């Protein structure tokens, strides 16, 4: 049986699928990355599953980074056609923008947060992450788009996950595992120093919380795919 296609838009090389990368083929998907701003992104439109990962740019940066406008248009096409799409962090923000919601500077979150599913979220894939703190790192946030269903919040940010048809968007980072984390702290060294983060303490938190988060994240992914 042929694998289905999973096309992933990646904004920086060190922000990849993390713990999801090995799991997606087991769930029946062949993964192909497209590099934002470099590759032709049109294959994303017709993929069986589209995933949009995070990155340091934002919806408000479209004037400097034309890929933002292109991605929003491609995502809108997929959402209008109810093609399964999964957005992570920036991916959530781009999905929200594609649905006409406001996206901009918001509450800065960095570290481990309890993701609090709504009553609707508790009967879907988001229930899988209710028991373990998940990793967050973002400064922008989105309002809930019209027609979307709110699935989860944190104490500080009201829209941490929503669904729209067969698509799912999450503001937190379920894909992060220890190897991904290590690439992130190297790639974001300047920002971490500027905001006074102790990398050894940050790493120790990952070592403590990472295994439970990865376990919950894989269950989230499996539940999402099973529901398509």
Segments predicted by a language model, with ranges:
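Flexible gly/pro-rich beta->alpha loop and the following alpha-helix that scaffold active-site loops
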Residues: 22-86
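Catalytic nucleophile loop
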Residues: 78-102
């Amino acid at each position: 049986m042929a694998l289905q296609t999973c096309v992933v838009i990646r904004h920086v090389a060190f922000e990849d699928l993390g713990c999801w990368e090995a799991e997606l083929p087991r769930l029946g998907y062949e993964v192909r990355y497209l590099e934002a701003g470099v590759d032709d992104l049109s294959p994303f439109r017709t993929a069986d599953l589209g995933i949009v990962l995070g990155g340091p740019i934002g919806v408000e940066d479209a004037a400097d980074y034309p890929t933002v406008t292109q991605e929003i248009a491609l995502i809108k096409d997929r959402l209008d056609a109810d093609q399964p799409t999964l957005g992570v962090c920036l991916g959530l923000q781009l999905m929200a923008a594609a649905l006409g919601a406001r996206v901009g500077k918001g509450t800065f979150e960095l570290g481990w947060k309890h993701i609090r599913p709504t009553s609707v979220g508790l009967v879907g894939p988001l229930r899988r992450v209710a028991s373990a703190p998940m990793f967050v790192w973002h400064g922008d946030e989105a309002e809930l788009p019209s027609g979307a269903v709110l699935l989860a919040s944190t104490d500080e940010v009201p829209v941490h996950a929503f669904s729209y048809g067969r698509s799912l968007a999450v503001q937190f980072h379920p894909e992060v595992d220890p190897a991904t984390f290590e690439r992130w702290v190297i790639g974001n060294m300047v920002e971490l120093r500027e905001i006074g983060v102790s990398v050894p303490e940050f790493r120790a938190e990952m070592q403590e919380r990472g295994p439970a988060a990865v376990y919950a994240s894989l269950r989230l992914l499996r539940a999402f795919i099973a529901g398509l």
